[in-house]
Amino acid sequence: MVLEIVLITGMSGSGKSVALHALEDAGYYCVDNLPPQLLPAFVALEHHHHGNRVAIAMDVRSATSLHQVPQELHRLRSQGVAVQSIFLDATIDTLVRRFSETRRRHPLSHDDPQQERKALVQIIDLERELLADLREASHVIDTSQIRASQLQSYVKSLMPGAQGQLTLVFQSFAFKRGIPMDADYVFDVRMLANPYYEPALRELTGLDEPVADFLQLQPDVDLMRAHIEQFLAHWLELLDRNHRSYVTVAIGCTGGQHRSVYLVERLAQSFGNRWTALKRHRELDGRQ
């Protein structure tokens, strides 16, 4: 059987432990804070002792060796290992708030607590710089506006793509709450007719049939969908040929409730026949 390796990295406070626990629940043998220089020996050992599914978490405490990881992942892939690298991220405001709420110290913090509070933003900026190469080589998940249970479910949903097939993630969002940090492509659909201004549709979402019926009658909506599909169809083929594992396509409208949700549903349906297509509705998920 093909050996599956899932690497979990990312910013301190972004949810790496939550993601690792999700993989443990899914049947992966998990290890936390593995030094990067031990990765080759560990992979060889665990393949013989713990089966075919291994998840590894690394953080910035191994910063001096992390630059080796992308090259090592490439080597493992060339040997037929199915490797996924997931990088968890969040906005700086979110990370600062999480450290404040948990009262935990940042791994790169100074010994002086007073200095730590003053420098937390600078420490996070330094961490982001140290992890930049690893982030570039990974599938990025923005955890700023999702709960732990939602992150666990999302990480588990990514696992079927471990065999190297391109996985598309279509995500709806509200511009007023910020563009998702993990988006590879962002499409603005705020110029389309808004069901919010129809009293009978205001409290519904793009998942509801009356909203879908309304939007299907708008020529510009269908034209927007067709143009997005045409753009993606061309470039996804190239990304697939270059062995890209994940592409996140974010569709944004004003409230993330009607237009973007509807288009995400239609795009996922359209591209699901060719690739693995996942759906996320950021603002709707936050209601649950």
Swiss-Prot record:
Q: What role is this protein assigned?
A: Displays ATPase and GTPase activities.
Top-level taxonomic group: Bacteria
Annotated organism of origin = Verminephrobacter eiseniae (strain EF01-2)
So where does GTP get bound?
Answer: 59-62
Taxonomy of origin reads:
Bacteria, Pseudomonadati, Pseudomonadota, Betaproteobacteria, Burkholderiales
Cystines in this chain: none
Question: What's a Pfam family in this record?
Answer: RapZ-like_N
**Any GO MF annotation of the entry:** GTP binding
- Cross-referenced NCBIfam families: PRK05416.1
| Residues at which ATP binds | 10-17
Return the similarity comment: Belongs to the RapZ-like family.
Give the matching SUPFAM superfamilies.
P-loop containing nucleoside triphosphate hydrolases
The protein in question is named Nucleotide-binding protein Veis_1053
Record HAMAP family? RapZ_like
Q: Which UniProt keywords apply?
A: ATP-binding, GTP-binding, Nucleotide-binding
